[in-house]
């Protein structure tokens, strides 16, 4: 998943309307919406924002840190200032796309961890192993990286998640569709320069 560079105004308006509707004050909250990809008589029209969840707590996982990276800010200090002083003067800085990618152990990836780190060393913000309790949903090895452009982020996902078996083409096509859901009006990314694939490991002799 990823944090988009600039929040669409309809999403911002929906979030603020939810805050007002629930009378929320001095809470670190997150709301979940989805955008309709086609017309549904019982739900709404294509492109419309529909509410899914209202959560009176911070978003889970690494998301608060990713918001910090994506907005060059500190949501923890903003929250503390809000509780202590009723507001904050902490500015929001430059905006980025912030991407989370998780790899599962046992898969044969086209590019090694070392190659990914070499190519994206200037983009990386967090790199770590994921605890076993969370790995079922998030993978075993995680990467969080910032990008100024959508194209750069899409190439990052393509590189990190590329596998050597015959499922790769289908997986890459599905990845492109999923990424497009975040910004439906964004044009498809142009292909970027590729890494040199890692040499396959030799099989151990029995």
Report the location of each language-model feature.
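Intrinsically disordered, low-complexity acidic/polar segments
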Residues: 40-42, 61-63, 110, 152-154
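A short beta-strand motif that forms the metal-chelation/ATP-contact edge
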Residues: 41-58
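Active-site "cap" helix and flanking loop/linker of ATP-utilizing ligase/carboxylase catalytic domains
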Residues: 12-31, 55-106
């Amino acid at each position: 998943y990823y944090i988009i560079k600039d929040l669409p105004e309809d999403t911002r308006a929906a979030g603020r309307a939810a805050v007002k509707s629930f009378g929320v004050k001095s809470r670190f909250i997150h709301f979940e919406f989805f955008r309709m990809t086609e017309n549904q008589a019982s739900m709404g029209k294509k492109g419309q924002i529909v509410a899914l969840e209202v959560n009176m707590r911070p978003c889970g996982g690494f998301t608060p840190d990713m918001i910090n990276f994506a907005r060059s800010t500190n949501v923890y200090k903003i929250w503390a200032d809000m509780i202590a002083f009723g507001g904050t003067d902490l500015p929001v800085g430059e905006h980025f796309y912030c991407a989370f990618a998780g790899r599962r152990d046992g898969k044969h990836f086209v590019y090694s961890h070392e190659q990914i780190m070499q190519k994206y060393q200037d983009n990386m913000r967090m790199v770590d192993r994921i605890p076993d309790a969370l790995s079922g949903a998030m993978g075993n090895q995680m990467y969080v990286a910032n990008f100024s452009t959508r194209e750069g982020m899409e190439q990052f996902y393509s590189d990190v998640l590329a596998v050597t078996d015959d499922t790769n083409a289908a997986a890459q096509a599905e990845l492109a569709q999923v990424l497009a859901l975040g910004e439906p009006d964004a044009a498809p990314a142009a292909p970027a320069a590729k890494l040199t694939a890692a040499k396959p490991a030799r099989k151990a002799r029995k």
